[in-house]
Amino acid sequence: MFGFLKQVGDYTRDAVDAARNLTQGLAVTFDHMKRRPVTVQYPYEKLIPSERYRGRIHYEFDKCIACEVCVRVCPINLPVVDWVMNKETKKKELRNYSIDFGVCIFCGNCVEYCPTNCLSMTEEYELAAFDRHSLNFDNVALGRLPTSVTTDPAVQPLRELAYLPAGEVQPHGVDPSRPRAGQRPDQVLSSLKQNAGGSAGNEGESATSTNTSKGSAE
């Protein structure tokens, strides 16, 4: 008898523990359901990186002193610094500087330890290429100003067409009652047609009212 009661007690305790664990898991799931969707319609929608995002490295040739600190602090000794010694001034003269982004791990050590701040991280993250050799950027390519996501010509016209309405595109920290930050192309076309039809209807109504007012005046 006591053995049966013990089994019932153990079963009840296990059932309560299982229900508690299930409730905790569902609480986490329901918490995520309150958040906005994370998936975006790339490349028509692009997430704006944070200020500390580590993207493509920007390089300023005029500030570089060829000290090779970036090479020493790099975990894989990636930067290639080509310089010669000027016998007259007894100083280094920089000839070329290159970084292969196909190998770079974007740790940011070169930017952090550069004594002249000639290296900086940008928000540019679209570095895909068909040829891996094209990812080896020289000082000219590294000196190119980065393309900002907010001023991307492929996104800006769609932003004006209400594809990306004003507001944050970040999924968290936004009022859940607000509509999704972005519409699909068919929704954009339908909204544009509705706006065009509404404006045409308003013009027709204004023209009818004008004719009516003229007739009453006569």
UniProtKB/Swiss-Prot annotation:
Catalytic reaction list: a plastoquinone + NADH + (n+1) H(+)(in) = a plastoquinol + NAD(+) + n H(+)(out); a plastoquinone + NADPH + (n+1) H(+)(in) = a plastoquinol + NADP(+) + n H(+)(out)
Documented EC number(s): 7.1.1.-
Phylogenetic placement of the source organism: Bacteria, Bacillati, Cyanobacteriota, Cyanophyceae, Synechococcales
EC category name: translocase
Free-text remark on how the cofactor is bound: Binds 2 [4Fe-4S] clusters per subunit.
Gene: ndhI
Residues the record lists as binding [4Fe-4S] cluster 2: C74, C104, C107, C110
Binding site for [4Fe-4S] cluster 1: C64, C67, C70, C114
Disordered: region residues: 168-218
Domain 4Fe-4S ferredoxin-type positions: 55-84, 95-124
Family matches, as PANTHER family: NAD(P)H-QUINONE OXIDOREDUCTASE SUBUNIT I, CHLOROPLASTIC (PTHR47275:SF1)
One Gene Ontology cellular component: plasma membrane-derived thylakoid membrane
Organism listed in the record: Synechococcus sp. (strain WH7803)
Cofactor: [4Fe-4S] cluster
Protein name: NAD(P)H-quinone oxidoreductase subunit I
Entry similarity comment: Belongs to the complex I 23 kDa subunit family.
Polar residues: compositionally biased ranges: 208-218
Domain of life of the organism encoding this protein: Bacteria
Assembly and binders: NDH-1 is composed of at least 11 different subunits.
Main location: membrane
One Gene Ontology term of the molecular function aspect: iron ion binding
Keywords assigned by UniProt, alphabetized: 4Fe-4S, Iron, Iron-sulfur, Membrane, Metal-binding, NAD, NADP, Plastoquinone, Quinone, Repeat, Thylakoid, Translocase
